[in-house]
């Protein structure tokens, strides 16, 4: 490709609204342009990278035995009503009606559509296993689109759906897709980790996320220092406490704390150790219990894990904190003064709180706390659950090593759905025993456009992007110095371009009438792995200059050896 025939729209300055490095560099390198909030046009350089990602994903998913199809982006709303997800998805699901007032949605995912397809096309277990996938545009009406294509409203995604006659078959399909993901991400040159995950709105039982490790990642992942255990922060657990409840050494005392409305203020003003405090959080209750509010009690230095909380049957999903007015109407006190002693509401205690003794908590009276609280003596211990986020240094749940935390960008997710969708949508076939059997489903997603941004987060320097070779928009750049003034340089550049192109190598030939400095900056910015510089002085010595984008090394190469050297670099 010649730059004279190409849209090379690079920017010198970083746009003000670009927060993370991938968004900045994708704009500066002319990969994308913003059309509206969360909506981007992919320019030639970006589209070439996107297609590279798609092709690697397609090859590995094909190798796993999946079959490609293409489903509509527009889906009938009635399918979503069949599974009950029409409301569970919330405002992210974009709804609209056609001219005949028939309701539709813009696809954020396709479980309903593919299940509808399979229930009409498959009738016997003999047609299984079956794994169908597509690479298609999706839309989720994000409340706050940010970070460029990392969290856009419209995005490209590979979504696959497996159908098996039994759980054993589902597990085989699931493992095959897990392995395909690993092969795809390995080929892309990404540093990533598969981690245990919560199934969220998709539903089902087991699931794993695949995270590209990056400091800019929105997600925290936890992993053991000495084992293979890894989970996202929503799913991660620490080893359950094994210590017995310590004996009381203090009498419970009511203390005036008028200026201590937070745990930090309580610790600072009254000298309590923070691990000897608890905080009591009031959340909306589900219909499972005869109460409007349920209290969740965690240690003062811990944070509530909202996913763990809303997975409890007593807690409304999605999780909703009680308003202060509601709390005051029930208790007569506000947040900052709440605690378990005398609390006439259902409450659930975190595992770490259940083994605490002599601790402090709000007295359910504004400006007062109890110190020296002990379970059994001052308040009966209620239901005990794992409610908190893990922290660095926690013991790993496998019993090997301690928990470490890193930031990651989720680029893939795989689920064992079981019969969660197939049962609701009557997706049944004739089983081997001659009876009707509900299909076991798995679903699998890869954020194709998000991978592009994630790769940049891992591969950049002060000059721009440093693409892994497998994802680079071009493999080689040819930069002729002052070609317009030198027939020798022009002839050598044209000859090299023809040879490399004939060898099937993807080349960007910078034939612009630009200063060499401008050309070099653009080539480095867009991240082409290998650059050949051609100038009069080097040609007089029978050489061309080779530059490696990743390490910056330059070396003079005999003209006759350049093509072979490039082939070896790309092998």
Swiss-Prot record:
The keyword Transferase does not apply. PROSITE patterns: AA_TRNA_LIGASE_II. GO terms for cellular component: cytosol. The keyword Ligase applies. It catalyses: tRNA(Pro) + L-proline + ATP = L-prolyl-tRNA(Pro) + AMP + diphosphate. Belongs to the class-II aminoacyl-tRNA synthetase family. ProS type 1 subfamily. PANTHER family: MITOCHONDRIAL RIBOSOME PROTEIN L39/PROLYL-TRNA LIGASE FAMILY MEMBER (PTHR42753), PROLINE--TRNA LIGASE (PTHR42753:SF2). Catalyzes the attachment of proline to tRNA(Pro) in a two-step reaction: proline is first activated by ATP to form Pro-AMP and then transferred to the acceptor end of tRNA(Pro). As ProRS can inadvertently accommodate and process non-cognate amino acids such as alanine and cysteine, to avoid such errors it has two additional distinct editing activities against alanine. One activity is designated as 'pretransfer' editing and involves the tRNA(Pro)-independent hydrolysis of activated Ala-AMP. Consists of three domains: the N-terminal catalytic domain, the editing domain and the C-terminal anticodon-binding domain. This is Proline--tRNA ligase. It comes from Photobacterium profundum (strain SS9).
